[in-house]
């Protein structure tokens, strides 16, 4: 059986009511240039911070940005909430629940 570990700062709720409380936060480090005269700066993304080593039978729920970085690093044990799926439930413009996860 697969164990899900939520490494986002939010409780993730599936459409069936299953909830995954936050168990920590994985993120991608970043650095910024100074703002130009138009108020625009450049961002450079770095390493993933807060993502544990791979564990057999564990999938880590992470943000889409962390998922992208993890995939680029060869990780296959990360998923992100399917916030763009047509079955995602929204109320007043906010996501209430998702139908599942994307890899």
Located regions from the model:
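Intrinsically disordered, low-complexity segments enriched in small/polar residues
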Residues: 2-3, 7-11, 15-103
């Amino acid at each position: 059986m697969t164990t899900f570990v939520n490494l986002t700062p939010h409780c993730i709720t599936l459409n069936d009511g299953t909830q995954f409380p936050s168990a920590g936060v994985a993120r991608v480090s970043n650095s910024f240039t100074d703002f130009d005269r138009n108020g625009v700066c450049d961002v450079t993304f770095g390493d993933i911070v807060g993502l544990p080593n791979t564990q057999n039978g564990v999938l880590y729920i992470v943000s889409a940005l962390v998922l992208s970085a993890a995939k680029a690093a060869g990780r296959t044990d990360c998923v992100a909430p399917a916030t763009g799926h047509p079955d995602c439930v929204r109320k007043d413009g906010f996501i209430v629940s998702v139908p599942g996860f994307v890899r």
